[in-house]
Swiss-Prot record:
Annotated region described as Disordered, given as residue ranges: 472-494, 813-843
One of the protein's GO biological processes: response to metal ion
EC numbers, comma separated: 2.7.11.-
Organismal lineage: Eukaryota, Viridiplantae, Streptophyta, Embryophyta, Tracheophyta
Annotated binding of ATP, by residue: I524, G525, V526, G527, G528, F529, G530, S531, V532, K547
Annotated Gene Ontology cellular component terms: membrane; plastid
Entry-linked SMART domains: S_TKc
UniProt GO molecular function: ATP binding; protein serine/threonine kinase activity; transmembrane receptor protein tyrosine kinase activity
Compartments reported by the entry: Membrane
Descriptive protein name: Putative receptor-like protein kinase At5g39000
Membrane topology summary: Single-pass type I membrane protein
Residue ranges, Cytoplasmic side: 467-873
Active site (record annotation): D646 (proton acceptor)
Length: 873
């Protein structure tokens, strides 16, 4: 169930807010409400005073950069103030607000409609910045409103901005567009209100043993603020709106909202009255089933929050024990899970708060998603903790706040959402509605509706008949189809080598036969796309891997189509081969060649170390070389550069002969298509830990992003440990930093996989580490192309085999395609380079010499790829 975050701040301003939280005592030092484009002060329906813009806050280029206009039409539910007037910007325009130093709520009000003949806000795209923070980038208020659920006509964007003297708010129209705003609200908030932590002054970093610290200079965007189990309420201090969670909670596990008699919330110094109003702490959602509490063990209380992937989020949970039957510790205890990770194992509200009707709140931080899509469903689950044998198998929650934190570049902007329905099916809000005579409209409407009903009944009848015929004669044959789909062929004979632009189209009957109707015991892998089954086709003659799209998959049909199109046109010994696909009966299935030896990760992190032997150093090098050649082909062997975007150990497969196959092309992207392009700009997708930091920061994608991910794989191959670990000293927690640190000190041999200590040779290790560390440089321009990576890995293998044969102990060697060897420096990349001159004159610390192809005349060069003489594509 996907609900867009926009519903939170699209509350009808015309509806009076109930339950104002009378006990709120915070009085903000600054409260500004500006009705943009208006020339006089006005009062809105809730009694708040909005002032007209004045010269003190307006930019000096007022006349040239902007103009004001009135909305041509007022939709039902849209209030007069502040939405019926707007300031519209032709060019960059800045408001300057003198405010008291500290953090402030900044709320921007937008009503995308037509404003006279001069401006249609539906076509408006613009950016908004405040004091160095990017709040919105190429923002479309119209697309944002259309994607809201439930549908609204306007949107309020709320931010929290640290201000030291002046709040400078800048609107910048996108190319060939105009910017606009209807209202601006600024409200100061208590010192460190969202940065100090929960009532216990702690911010739990989900998935880490180290608590999180939020700097006072951090900016936030409010994404959700929920009154769990209750109705929409407000508070008088900071004018926040707490929205019902009915649209967010999963319907199948919605629990109950207990009705509690009038109670008094006992606020404390740790949880003062301005944290949340009475109505939030007096209402809640619990699991219920008092007569059969054991049923609560079969499900969770679950909320799904649709957010922008790739950002860090502050999740604030509000609790208050209001059930009179819970009157001592240990009676209602539950666990909190965020993003399927344990946030709090043992949550006892009565014990932690100090008793009944005493509110408390806890703060957590989490990174949402893996950059694999524009949107991500951040998941919150509550489940009874059985291990301590509580009196009630139950859980409770009163309120939720979710705030997005700015990234290292000061960015809070996410991409524009896709509309939930086709724009052609949405009434055009940009055109004022013409009020016609109702006496003419009614008979026309009845006639149209009647015709549509008859037509719909006819279509349904035809579909039912066709479905019955289809069931009586099921399709059992596959066909070969070009992409996009063409006329089916009756040829079902499997081909040894598929044409580059063809793949086999299976019937759902064949797929179910191949997998025993998707039998669970045949599952050999699970990923973001869905489950992968081991199957047999063509009467058991061919083993295949069958990847089935799950309905709840975050990746979905777009990635299905991407992988189908990519792999149907790409053929390489080190790319997994696509045999075919199926898209019948609402199923999306891809069929690949079967990889008996599974993934590289399976062999690095062996489950049964007694029966599964470790990979030798030679085997690891061969696997890495195969994967590198596959990437090299993607980057330089096709018509255009193809960027994989999700290179990791689980996407490197091994066949029966341990030949490497790069897999999973659902996130792949075609790179620059002309010489004038150096990159493509795109939403960040990939897997954290493997994600190129430069790509993450700038959203600029090049083939060097794949190089970074592959470098992380090389480090895993070398050290055989996860990218991030918690049960180690802080300096060892991050694999990349840990290896770089040891690389600088010359102690990499002390952190390699213990299974390699007696197998790996020093010269091979040095060359391998050199190229691996170069791959994971922070700046893309400092990383090598895949041509160089392949060459270096092949050289590392040659050094290993030579040393094994001759039993030499060469301490140092470097080789460059130019025939020159670099001199020693203190930089990371040159730690192992201690030789000078031609490669034929390499000297080592023990005076032994290894001559490898002096002046490229030796035969040893034959073991390397032809990329020693790289040619332009």
């Amino acid at each position: 169930m996907i609900r867009h975050a926009l519903l939170i701040f699209s509350i009808l301003v015309s509806t009076p807010i109930v339950g104002e939280g009378a006990t709120s005592t915070y009085e903000p030092t600054d409260v500004f409400l500006f009705n943009c484009g208006d020339t006089s002060n006005n009062v809105d329906v809730s009694g708040r005073n909005w002032t007209a813009e004045n010269q003190k806050i307006l930019s000096s280029n007022l006349v040239n950069a902007s103009f004001t206009a009135q909305a041509s039409y007022q939709e039902s539910g849209v209030s007069q103030i502040p939405y019926m007037t707007a300031r519209i910007f032709r060019s960059e325009f800045t408001y300057s607000f003198p405010v008291t130093p500290g953090s402030n709520f900044l709320r921007l009000y937008f009503y995308p409609t037509r404003y006279g003949s001069q401006f249609n806000a539906v076509k408006s795209f613009f950016s908004v910045k405040v004091n160095g923070f990017t709040l919105l980038n190429n923002f479309s208020a119209d697309l944002t409103v259309k994607a809201s659920k439930p549908q609204t006509e306007f949107i309020i964007k709320e931010f929290i901005i640290p201000v030291y003297q002046t709040l400078n708010l800048t609107f910048t129209p996108s190319l060939d567009s105009l910017a606009f705003v209807n209202g601006i609200e600024i409200v100061s908030i208590p010192n460190r209100f969202y940065s100090k932590g929960g009532f216990d002054d702690v911010i739990t970093n989900v998935g880490s043993s180290v608590d999180f610290h939020i700097e006072n200079s951090t900016a936030f965007e409010t994404v959700y603020r929920l009154n769990v189990g209750g109705k929409t309420v407000g508070d008088s201090g900071m004018f926040r709106r707490w929205v019902s969670d009915d649209e967010i909670i999963l319907s199948e596990s919605s629990g109950i909202s207990p009705i509690v008699p009038d109670i008094k919330i006992n606020y404390t110094e740790k949880t003062p009255s301005y944290v949340a109003p009475d109505d939030v702490y007096a209402t809640s959602r619990s699991m219920g089933n008092a007569d059969h509490p054991e049923q609560n063990l079969n499900f969770n209380l679950t909320w799904l929050f649709t957010v922008d992937a790739g950002f860090s989020y502050l999740v604030r949970l509000h609790f208050c024990e209001t059930l009179s039957e819970v009157n001592k510790e240990g009676q209602r205890v539950f666990s909190i899970f965020i993003e399927n990770q344990t946030a709090t194992l043992e949550m006892d509200v009565f014990r932690m708060s100090g008793g009944s009707w005493i509110p408390m709140y806890l703060d957590y931080t989490v990174i949402a998603g893996s950059g694999s899509g524009r949107r991500h469903d951040l998941r919150l689950d509550l489940h009874p903790l059985v291990s301590i044998n509580p009196k009630y198998y139950d859980a409770i929650l009163n309120g939720v706040e979710i705030l997005k934190m700015n990234d290292p570049d000061g960015n809070l902007a996410g991409p524009n959402p896709d509309p939930l329905v086709s724009p052609d099916l949405i009434p055009n809000r940009a055109t004022p509605r013409i009020r016609k005579n109702k006496s003419h409209i009614l008979p026309i409407t009845l006639a149209v509706v009647g015709s549509l009903v008859v037509l719909a009944m006819f279509v349904v009848g035809v579909l039912v008949i066709m479905k019955k015929k289809k069931k009586s004669k099921p399709s059992t044959n596959s066909s070969w189809c070009p992409l996009p789909h063409g006329t089916d062929s009756t040829n079902t004979k499997p081909a040894k080598s598929l044409p580059a632009d063809l793949c086999r189209r299976f019937s759902i009957f064949e797929i179910k036969s191949a997998t025993n109707d998707f039998e669970d015991k045949l599952i050999i892998g699970v990923g973001g796309f869905g489950s992968v089954y081991k199957g047999q086709i063509d009467g058991g003659a061919t083993l295949v891997a069958v990847k089935r799209l799950e309905i709840t998959s975050n990746q979905g049909a777009k990635e299905f189509e991407t992988e189908l199109e990519m792999l149907s046109k790409l053929r390489h010994v080190h790319l997994v081969s696509l045999i075919g696909y199926c898209d019948e009966d609402n199923e999306m299935v891809l069929v690949y060649e079967y990889m008996p030896h599974g993934t590289l990760k399976d062999h690095l992190f062996r489950r049964d170390k007694t029966s599964d032997p470790p990979l030798s150093w030679k085997r690891r090098l061969e696997i890495c070389i195969g994967a590198a050649r596959g990437l090299q082909y993607l980057h330089t062997g096709a018509k255009y550069t193809i960027i994989h975007r999700d290179i990791k150990t689980t996407n490197i497969l091994l066949d029966e002969n341990f030949v490497t196959k790069v897999s999973d092309f659902g996130l792949s992207r075609v790179g620059p298509t002309s010489a004038s392009q150096t990159h493509v700009s795109t939403v960040v997708k990939g897997t954290f830990g493997y994600l190129d930091p430069e790509y993450y920061r700038r959203q600029v994608l090049t083939e060097k992003s794949d190089v970074y991910s592959f470098g992380v794989v090389l480090l895993e191959v070398l050290c055989c440990r996860p990218i991030r670990m918690q049960s180690v000293p802080p300096e060892q927690a991050d694999l990349i930093r840990w290896v770089k640190s040891n690389y600088r000190r010359g102690t990499v041999d002390q952190i390699i996989d213990s299974d390699l200590s007696a197998d790996i040779t020093s010269t091979s290790l040095e060359k391998f580490c050199e190229i691996a560390v170069r791959c994971v440089q922070d700046r893309g321009m400092e990383r090598p192309p895949m041509n160089d990576v392949v060459w270096a890995l092949e050289f590392a293998l040659q050094l290993h085999e030579t040393a094994k044969k001759k039993n030499d102990n060469v301490e140092s060697l470097d080789l460059m395609p130019s025939g020159e060897v670099g001199t020693t420096t203190d930089g990371e990349d040159d730690l192992f380079s201690r030789t000078t001159g031609h490669v034929g004159k390499s000297t080592t610390t023990d005076d032994s010499v290894l001559v490898v192809g002096d002046e490229r005349s030796g035969s040893s060069w034959g073991v390397f790829s032809e990329i020693n003489e790289p040619k332009a594509r």
